[in-house]
Amino acid sequence: MFFLDNTDSMTSSSRGITMPNTISSHEDVGGYSPRKVGIQHDYSAVGGGGAAFHHLHTSAATPRHVATSEFYDDEEATSPRGGIEIGAGGGKMMANLRRHRQRERETYEDEDVLSSSDESSGRPIPRYVGRDTDHVFGEFEMDDEDVVMRREDGYGEDETDEDYFDEEEPVAELLPLGGGTRRVPRTPGRKNSSKCGFFDYYKLTDEHLGSGAYGSVTTCKSIKSGVEYAVKIVDKQGETHSRKRILREVNIFKTCKDHPNIVQLLDWFEDETNFYLVMEKMRGGPLLQHILQRKYFTEEEARRVTKDISLALKFMHDRGIAHRDVKPENVLCTDPNHVSPVKLCDLDLASQRPPQHERHPLSQVASEPDLASPVGSAEFMAPEVVDAYVGDSLKYDKKCDTWSLGVILYIMLAGYAPFQGMCDDEDCGWSEGKPCEDCQQDLFHRIQDGYYEFPEEEWGMISEEAKDLVSNLLKRDPVDRFNADQILSHRWLQQSAASTILQTPSNLINRKDSARDVQQMSEHFNLMNRLADTRLSARFDNKMTMSECGSDLGTATIHGDGSFLSMGGEPFGTFPRKKSVGIAIEKSRSGEFTPPISRASPTTPPPSMLNLSEDLTDSPVKRRSADDSGTFSLFSPASSNGDDSICSPPMVFVDMPSIQLFGTGALLTSVQMTPRHTTEDDASLKSFEDEQENANPIHRIETQVNV
């Protein structure tokens, strides 16, 4: 086990090192000099509230680590292949990607890097690669400002960190956000008590905080103090998550130590099966969780979050580090009851490229050297990262992080993402976290085009200053995009923002003038990575006209199973089933489809039609909760031909199990119901409803659209 203590700064080659019996030498770990073994400080003051680590992303990426103070030349770029989460459907696309160039590399092995001082001192040569008997772990003193990263005297002068860390790793399969995570085997207990390891100082609890493609995050407790921490456990047996990659992450954490807006690494350990990264435990949850749960946010709260993230990015960018996976899941809140302050976490995909001040300082270049491997989460990827992923480009710079911040800010202010992917497949599961190559490609095209809108219905109440900042963050060209310094100096962050309600999914529906209705964020679906589910299952080329409505029949609740109940709970009818939806929509578009007309007997209620008011027909409208249910006002349509049939406008069936009542430019304004006719039908419907109620409680949107 390697620890950094508060001893003097002399090099390790001139200092005696105390190690466990199985380790009698030392190793240069990512630029850190090994120190004496032993816990020498108490972490009881660390943590202090904060957000639990959640949904860890550890997608494969080409490690890029530089420990010098100079930029590497642009020709040092690696292949534009990397890991992004999109899904099994993305694997086919990945297989068709072609590399534009590939460089020969020399692999750096631990046993090959030996200093002359090591050989002359008579100390055994460290050979940890491929040996199960070696047990290596380490710890850092986080409060010693004098302890800096240094290199061993004997670390080969001709070798660079690029040689050490530049390891080609396989491309990870693209998964939709929130989908396809793999479970990591539970960490085994300590087998040899004579070795000091993670379980000598900490014990795991049953509280699981999150998981990712290659690891999991769990709560652990210090055996000495009882203080809780979050431990990231990474399975070292995986093919793509190498030891060198972990060391790079540890090194970047060390560089970012003590920053108030970056989660702190406290310990790290390694045994024969896993890596253990012990970090401060945050208790406020990820920012995404707050967006989903809170009903009211203000521009002031959004401003504070933006400022905190910008401060973290400025700190990292000034040190040549790009985060490359900025998203709401990786922004952790310190307080469960407040959205700010926040801390940036998960540096697994970060890439370190310190600026070359002597040649061209950061402030004097429009675009910094490329970061090569495209990584991150799809909805938050900058256009240049998408270009690198699809092979249209071989480089992008640290401004990819400020684009991602722009997407987050847009979401905080509007409640949905500026860019979404969609397709025409009825059975597409993209919105539920399942892979869909068509949706993925559509999303990429939209991001590459860089086109987005500020719909008046949601953005009319948002200040022009906030919109201006979003516009400058979502610039297609990185040269024109704001950097962290420009963000922090923007007038919206320099003043106290107006107390405007943050339009999140919970409160969008309460606005009477809202045309782009709720994007219900439900944990019932795996939407922790997908902020905007706006795939339309019904589109119309021309705007429909409203028919005259008769008397108000009250408020009805639409259930996900298609049943329709009146306010009193009495069964009123059912919607057509899912299979008829596609045909109905397509034929209705072309004018070839006429919905079946049900004539009611004098003893039964007349057919009813669901209508939305005229002012809601200009933009997409969506009503949906966790089980696709919603609450609306019912009206009995006026009959234009003297009978009780529904005549105008033409109506189509709605895909109840997935999407209800949307359109683009032209809104579906009517849905025909099948009225009840017989006692047998009523009994059958009631039986079905009772069965559904016993199986799953019905969730409802608690407001209605008033015509």
UniProtKB/Swiss-Prot annotation:
Serine/threonine-protein kinase which is required in the germline to positively regulate lifespan. May play a role in body wall muscle contraction. May be involved in embryonic cytokinesis. It catalyses: L-seryl-[protein] + ATP = O-phospho-L-seryl-[protein] + ADP + H(+); L-threonyl-[protein] + ATP = O-phospho-L-threonyl-[protein] + ADP + H(+). GO terms for biological process: behavioral response to nicotine; determination of adult lifespan; intracellular signal transduction; regulation of protein deneddylation. Belongs to the protein kinase superfamily. CAMK Ser/Thr protein kinase family. Residues 203-493 form the Protein kinase domain. It holds the Pfam family Pkinase. Its main location: nucleus. It comes from the Eukaryota. The active site is at 325 (proton acceptor). Signal peptide: none annotated. This is MAP kinase-interacting serine/threonine-protein kinase mnk-1. It comes from Caenorhabditis elegans. Disruption phenotype: RNAi-mediated knockdown causes a reduction in lifespan but not in a glp-4 bn2 mutant background. In an ife-2 ok306 mutant background, partially reduces the lifespan increase. In a rfl-1 or198 mutant background, partially rescues embryonic viability by restoring normal cytokinesis. Residues 1-29, 101-131, 589-628, 688-707 are annotated as: Disordered. Expressed in pharynx, intestine, vulva and body wall muscles.
